[in-house]
């Protein structure tokens, strides 16, 4: 197995030349096994670097089978030799958590940046691409992949292992990334010094599963009929109605009817625009895989011994606050539980910049430099 630096695109942070680390032993069964780890030279360089790690041939998924992709890709940001923070987001998130010149704003630029709550002058940040892989050069699979949050956590562990990360100072996971953080804490109880879980619980809520099930059937219908773009757009429209609250929709959109039946209402125009914008962000097969992974998610809270901070929103319909309260009751080492209302519902972690910034700043303030 090799560790490689790839994609040396220019960013606002200084980048480095491509390099390859010494080969590491193969064997998916050995991921995360406690051993002396020597920090990779990549951790000793400032700036943004993509890192690719080969996936062992014996890396088996929880429900059987193997990955067709050959590597897992992460991206390092921030200060060399600084405490490392892992950041993971929803199923639309990727390794570009921070802005770059070619990609524009990262998916969480409001929280990750120079002098931001997750301060790149103070921390080293690692984000990674979830499996199955996606990109212009990746052929879409004919069938969805059955993958769990534990599988994703083990892929992350491959990156950490071969970067030589002895301790993760904090794993901050939001939505699907929060589920992965919980799975990581369950599988590797001593690797992360703390978990920060935002808008995620130990299991999905059945009503949220029902909504995602409708989205999956729309995607499957698109595959069967060859109307893939329309299916992705329509499924995204439905998803958008579950992310936000009725208060936000009520404040943003006029309920006045158009002049003729069959014409779009203003709120429908908005949803259709969001659906069209999402067509290039995913494929039906990948969306089916990750949507199913959310609904397959299960962890035993009692097995998570690392200190945990929970951040939940009382208006979140996808991850109801009651589920997070149950999680809080069952965690053996709950540090704090932040509960707030937001008109943005499940998307609050992306939209409530000041609120999230204040919480993260407080949570991370005592990490040693």
Swiss-Prot record:
Primary residence: cytoplasm
GO annotation, biological process: homoserine metabolic process; methionine biosynthetic process
Chain positions recorded as substrate binding sites: 236, 347
Active site: 175, 316, 346
Site residues (Important for substrate specificity), renumbered to this chain: 176
Boundaries of every AB hydrolase-1 domain copy: 107-353
Molecular function, one GO term: homoserine O-acetyltransferase activity
Site (Important for acyl-CoA specificity): 212
InterPro entries: AB_hydrolase_1, AB_hydrolase_fold, HAT_MetX-like
Pathway: Amino-acid biosynthesis; L-methionine biosynthesis via de novo pathway; O-succinyl-L-homoserine from L-homoserine: step 1/1
Keyword Ribosomal protein among record annotations: no
UniProt keyword annotations, A-Z: Acyltransferase, Amino-acid biosynthesis, Cytoplasm, Methionine biosynthesis, Transferase
Protein family per UniProt: Belongs to the AB hydrolase superfamily. MetX family.
Protein name: Homoserine O-succinyltransferase
């Amino acid at each position: 197995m090799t560790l490689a630096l790839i994609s040396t695109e220019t960013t606002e942070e200084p980048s480095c030349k491509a390099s390859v680390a010494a080969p590491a032993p193969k064997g998916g069964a050995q991921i995360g096994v406690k051993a002396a780890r020597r920090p990779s030279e990549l951790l000793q360089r400032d700036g943004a670097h993509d890192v690719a790690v080969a996936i062992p041939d014996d890396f088996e998924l929880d429900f059987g089978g193997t990955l067709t992709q050959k590597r897992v890709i992460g991206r390092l940001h921030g200060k060399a030799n600084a405490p490392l923070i892992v950041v993971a987001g929803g199923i639309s998130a990727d390794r570009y958590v921070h802005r770059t010149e070619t990609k524009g704003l990262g998916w969480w630029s409001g929280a990750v940046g120079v002098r931001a709550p997750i301060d790149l002058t103070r921390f080293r940040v690692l984000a990674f691409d979830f499996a199955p892989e996606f990109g212009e050069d990746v052929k879409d699979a004919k069938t969805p992949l059955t993958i769990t949050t534990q599988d994703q956590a083990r892929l992350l562990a491959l990156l950490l292992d071969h970067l030589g990360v002895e301790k993760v100072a904090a794993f901050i996971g939001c939505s699907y990334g929060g589920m992965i953080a919980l799975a990581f804490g369950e599988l590797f109880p001593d690797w992360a010094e703390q978990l920060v879980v935002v808008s995620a619980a130990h299991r999905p809520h059945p009503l949220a599963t029902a909504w995602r099930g409708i989205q999956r059937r729309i995607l499957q219908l698109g595959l069967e009929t060859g109307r893939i773009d329309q299916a992705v757009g329509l499924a995204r429209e439905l998803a958008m109605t579950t992310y936000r609250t009725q208060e936000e929709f009520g404040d943003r959109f006029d309920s006045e009817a158009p002049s003729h039946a069959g014409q779009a209402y203003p709120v429908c125009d908005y949803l259709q625009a969001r659906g069209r914008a999402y067509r290039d962000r995913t494929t039906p097969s990948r969306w089916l895989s990750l949507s199913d992974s959310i609904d397959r998610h299960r962890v035993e809270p009692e097995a998570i011994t690392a200190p945990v901070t929970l951040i939940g929103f009382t208006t979140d319909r996808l991850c109801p606050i009651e589920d997070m309260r149950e999680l809080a009751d069952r965690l053996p080492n709950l540090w704090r539980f932040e509960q707030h209302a937001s008109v943005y519902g499940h998307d609050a972690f992306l939209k409530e910049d000041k609120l999230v910034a204040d919480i993260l700043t407080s949570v991370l303030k005592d990490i040693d430099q």
